[in-house]
Amino acid sequence: MSNRDSSEHGDSSNKIASNECNEATKLGFNFTQLWSQITTTYSLIDRNDSNMFNRDERVESEQEKKSVVILGKKYDDISVDDGVIEQDIYSKIWLTYRTGFEPIAKCLDGPQPLSFVQSMVFNRNPISSTFNNFHGLLDNDNFTTDVGWGCMIRTSQALLANTYQLLFLGRGFSYGRDRSPRHDEIIDMFMDEPRAPFSLHNFIKVASESPLKVKPGQWFGPNAASLSIKRLCDNVYESNGTGRVKVVISESSNLYDDIITQMFTTLNPVPDAILVLLPVRLGIDKVNPLYHASVLELLALRQSVGIAGGKPSSSFYFFGYKGNDLLYLDPHYPQFVRNKTSVYDTYHTNSYQKLSVDDMDPSMMIGILIKDINDYEDFKSSCTKSSNKILHFHPTSEKADRRGSLSEFKRKNSEFVCIESKDVQRREDFITIDNVSRDDLNNMEGFIDMADEFDSEIDQNNKDDNFDDDEPVNVSQTSIGEEYTSTAGSRP
C-alpha cells in the first residue's frame, strides 16, 4: 500500500468513524479508544499479509518451482502461480469469522462479548467488520460475532465442508466452472443460523454439553472440535439427512481393522463414508522434526481432507504443501452475514498463505476420509509403505495395547491427558479431558510424547532420578461402540 493510498484510506476511514462516533457516545460506548487501536494497527495488518500469495505481486523462487500437493493431488513442474492450481485452491471451501449473525447468549460465568472488541484490530478487514456489526458490539448479553475466539471452529467447519464436497462432488469439482446445486446445499449446512446442522451455533451447542462444557466465547481445542464434529454428524446420520458420515476419533492415532470393517458391514443404514479425526499433539512447542515428513505424507494421500491447526491461539485450514511450506486458508477475515443471493462466493477465496512445517504448532486435528473397505486398505497400505510415524494400524481392538509400547521410557516433555470413564454421560462420546498443570509434572510419571519412541536411546542415556520408571502408568481407558480413544500420545 503506497503512502498516498494509505493517506486516502485513512481520511475516508476517519470520516466513517466520525459519523458513527456520536451514536456510540450516546450509548455509552468508548469508541474513541477502539478507533485509535484500529488506525494505529492497520499498517501492521498490511505487513502481516506479506506471506500471502497474490496473482500479480510475487517473485518466484527456486522453492516455488517444486511440485505442489493439494489434498492428495500432485502438480508436477507447474508454477504455483498456474491457473490450474489457483482454480483448485479457489474451489476449496473457506470458512471465516462472521459478524451480525443471530445472537448466541453468553453464559453468566463465561466470557463477555465486549471483551473481544479489541481483538478486531488484528484481523484483515477490521473497519468493515466493526461497522457492519456495530450494534452487536453494544450487546453485553449476546455474541453476534466470533471474531477473536472462533477460528478453531471455522477451520473445523472447513475440514468438514471439504469432506462433504469431496465425498459428493468428487476431487475434480471446480467451483465457478462447475455449478452444482449440491455445492450450495453443502454450504447451506454451514450457514450461521441455528437451523443449519453444522452452524457455529450448533458447534457451540454440542460443545456446551457434558463432558466438554465449552462456553460461548471460549476457544476450542482439537479435542473439543473433533467431538463436536462427531456429535453433529451423528445427528445428521440418525435423521437420515444428506450425507451419512460416521466419525471415528482416535487421540492415540491407532486404527483397528476390525472396527472399520464392522462399521461398513453392520451399521444400518450403511454410512456413505467414515471420517477419521486425529486430535493429536506432535511435540512440545513445535512439531517434532521426526513428524515433518509424516504430516506432509498424510496431506499427499487421496484420503486426506486437511488439517485444522496452525499457531498457538490461531487455527488455520491446511490443504496442501509446496516443499516444506504448508499451504492454508486463513479464517481470521471477518465477513458480514449476507443474504443467499451473494453468500456462496464468500465461501471461496483466491488468497492462500504458507507456513513452514518447522513453525507449525504441534496441536492439530487431522482429517482422513474413508469411503469403503477397499479405500481403507489402500490408505493403510500407503501409510505402511511410507512408514508413517503418526498413524498405527492394528488387526483387532481386543488385544491391542492401547497404552502404546512406550511405558518403559520416561515421558518428560508433554502435557498429560487424563481420560476418566466415570465422566461419560453420553455413551456414544468419549469423555472429558483434564489437563494437569506443568507444575505437577515433576511428581507424575507417564508422560507420553510420541517422539520419545524414536528418542529412546537418548532418553536411556540421560536418566532423571526424579522419575521412577518402575511405577506403572495409571490411566483409565474408554472404548465405546464404534469409537475408540487412547492416551498413548500426548494431546492438548
Curated annotation (Swiss-Prot):
Coiled-coil stretches noted in the UniProt entry, renumbered to this chain: none
Q: Name one Pfam family in it.
A: Peptidase_C54
EC identifiers of the protein: 3.4.22.-
User: GO CC: one term?
Assistant: nucleus
Extract the ranges annotated as region (Disordered): 454-492
Q: Which SUPFAM superfamilies match?
A: Cysteine proteinases
Function, as annotated, reads: Cysteine protease that plays a key role in cytoplasm to vacuole transport (Cvt) and autophagy by mediating both proteolytic activation and delipidation of ATG8. Required for selective autophagic degradation of the nucleus (nucleophagy) as well as for mitophagy which contributes to regulate mitochondrial quantity and quality by eliminating the mitochondria to a basal level to fulfill cellular energy requirements and preventing excess ROS production. The protease activity is required for proteolytic activation of ATG8: cleaves the C-terminal amino acid of ATG8 to reveal a C-terminal glycine.
Which keywords label this protein? Autophagy, Cytoplasm, Hydrolase, Nucleus, Protease, Protein transport, Thiol protease, Transport
Q: Which residues form the active site?
A: C151 (nucleophile), D330, H332
What family does the Swiss-Prot or TrEMBL record give for this protein? Belongs to the peptidase C54 family.
Biased composition, class Polar residues, residue ranges: 474-492
Tell where it localizes.
Cytoplasm; Nucleus; Preautophagosomal structure
Highest taxon of source: Eukaryota
> What reaction does this enzyme carry out catalytically?
[protein]-C-terminal L-amino acid-glycyl-phosphatidylethanolamide + H2O = [protein]-C-terminal L-amino acid-glycine + a 1,2-diacyl-sn-glycero-3-phosphoethanolamine
Query: Could you tell me the gene encoding this protein?
Result: ATG4
Q: What is this protein called?
A: Probable cysteine protease ATG4
State the Gene Ontology terms under molecular function: cysteine-type endopeptidase activity; protein-phosphatidylethanolamide deconjugating activity
Major location, coarse class? cytoplasm
* GO BP term, example: autophagosome assembly
